[in-house]
Design a protein with these regions (language model features):
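Cytosolic catalytic cores of cyclic-nucleotide second-messenger enzymes
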Residues: 180
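Alpha-helix capping and helix-coil boundary motifs
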Residues: 6-9, 105-108, 177
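Active-site acidic/histidine proton-transfer and metal-coordination neighborhood
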Residues: 67-164
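Hydrophobic faces of well-ordered beta-strands that scaffold small-molecule active sites
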Residues: 1, 22-24, 57-61, 97-99, ...
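N-terminal pre-domain/capping segments
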Residues: 1-61, 65, 69-84
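Conserved small/polar residues in nucleotide/adenosyl-binding loops
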Residues: 169-176
Length: 180
């Protein structure tokens, strides 16, 4: 859903569609800018959610992040975005933040898995309320998350497992011939 008109307006549009949940982008999906919401906007958004019995809301992190990158600048950018977005989603009372694990860019899936899990151990906090979801990937090129085994390898290394989950994207799993 577009949040161009604000979170409350987006929630109103969801109600008009007879839906009870929504997915938004945490910020510009192809960049790094994000909107700051006034407390009144957040209160209005949460009131609409409560009044219409919304289920959990999902925010998607930008596509431009690569948590498995060997390039320090790219990796640090991704760490900053995830850290900021967890804090922001907690403030907005948005329950879930999903992200693409990234591409290992030739250094190997095992190294990509190590980088992702180390980053998650660094930024996840016991007091956070937002659950972070790893999204299944198609496995094109050097993408990490092409199999449930790769996602499991990341989750096994994360210390705060109760703050983690997997977002299963059927189309991507189908592209890799993954079976449930």
């Amino acid at each position: 859903m577009s949040i161009a008109g604000g979170l409350a307006k987006t929630a109103e549009n969801v109600v008009k569609m007879n839906a009870d949940t929504m997915q938004i982008f945490s910020r510009n999906p192809r960049g790094s800018s994000y909107k700051t919401y006034l407390p009144e906007e957040i209160e209005r958004f949460q009131k609409i959610r409560k009044d219409h019995a919304f289920g959990p809301v999902l925010a998607h992190a930008p596509y431009t992040m690569n948590l498995a990158s060997a390039t320090e600048k790219t990796y640090e950018f991704a760490c900053t975005v995830i850290r900021e977005d967890i804090r922001r989603m907690d403030e907005l009372q948005i329950e879930n933040l999903v992200f693409h694990p990234g591409s290992h860019t030739g250094q190997g899936a095992e190294e990509g898995i190590r980088l992702i899990s180390e980053m998650l151990n660094e930024i996840l906090k016991p007091e956070q309320t937002t659950t972070v979801l790893l999204e299944t990937m198609a496995g094109k090129g050097t993408e990490v998350g092409r199999s449930f085994e790769e996602l499991a390898a990341i989750l096994e290394r994360v210390e705060l497992k109760d703050h983690m989950a997997v977002s299963y994207t059927h189309l991507r799993a189908h592209e890799t011939s993954a079976h449930l």
